[in-house]
Amino acid sequence: MGAALATDVHQHLWPAELVDRLRARRRAPYLDGWTLHTRGEAPYDIDPAHHDVARRIEADQQDGVGLACVSLSAPLGIENLVRPEAGALIAAWHEGARALPDHFAAWASVPMVDPDLDELAALLRDGFVGVQLPATDLASPAAWERAAEVLRVAEEAGKPVFVHPGPEVVRPLAGTVPDWWAPVVGYVSQMQAAWWGWHAVHGRALFPRLRVLFGAGAGLAPVHHERHSARGGETPTIDPGVYVDTSSYGPQALDALVRVLGVDVLALGSDRPYAAPLGRLLGDAATYAIRVANPQRLLHEDRIETGEGRTWPRAS
């Protein structure tokens, strides 16, 4: 018997409906052929093969991935456009995502201005695995409170919320930076702010049944828990309903996360096509947990054991 197939909770694939809408635009975000233009990052040449459905399925199968959860690319800033523009692009995303083969599942998205809560509830009933929100819209305790209505819809539907890096802020005085700057500097700081915003607002008390996934290992924010405690923060308990994914990190970073959070809340998320799914992680048992068991629990287990008295271990 072969190894159990993995679930990758974090991939991106642009369906034709979304590509057509982006090409029809003349201001950011837009596509000129296959060159992507956004407000906060340099123009980026997209490889069309990265968004070819058949090639993606083949690549996933080679990596032992049986289900890929795809989401709208939040760094484009679509969710924060004026409402009619955001609505049209997000509708194109949902239309294209629905038509993908069964190898894929999809995260829903919402405009951050005047989100249609009834439509979101319908999408979550209609098979979308959860809702993705940009980290830039969850970057403080107050920001989490502003998103409360959307979070409540997900909680009532028994579906998780995926916190994903959002658009980079335009900084005219920053000068020229390398292409890796936004993913390594900007996105990481976004994820850290969202992580600490959730804890500072006491998110679990507000949303007792909500499952939350932080992309990119939450920017390794959990590894900073000792600094958080040293500077006056309360020592958080380990929350089995708050997950982090593995995207763009390797054994050293993931080992550090496991030392702090344990293995049960680390889920395979590759960010494909920008990185490949990790294969073997920290031994056989951990590999199975991260690639198979944890993603399935994130997506489907609508019950959270609060773990009274369990505090974050000291990394050593």
Question: Where are these predicted regions, by residue range?
Answer:
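Divalent metal-coordination and catalytic microenvironments
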Residues: H10, D60, A97, V131, ...
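Mid-to-C-terminal alpha-helical segments outside catalytic/metal-binding sites
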Residues: G2-V9, P15-L67, E95-G96, L210, ...
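Acidic-and-aromatic substrate-binding clefts and catalytic sites of carbohydrate-active enzymes
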Residues: I46-H51, I78-N80, V110-D118, L138-E145, ...
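Catalytic pocket-lining loop regions of alpha/beta-barrel enzymes
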Residues: D126-L261, V265-A267, P313-A315
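Short glycine-enriched loops at secondary-structure junctions
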Residues: M112-V113, P165-V170, P273-Y274
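Long, hydrophobic, well-ordered secondary-structure blocks that form the structural core
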Residues: G87, A99-R152
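Acidic (Asp/Glu)-rich catalytic clusters
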Residues: I57-G66, I90-H103, L120-G127, V150-A157, ...
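Short, well-structured secondary-structure segments
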Residues: P43, D47, R56-D60, G64-L89, ...
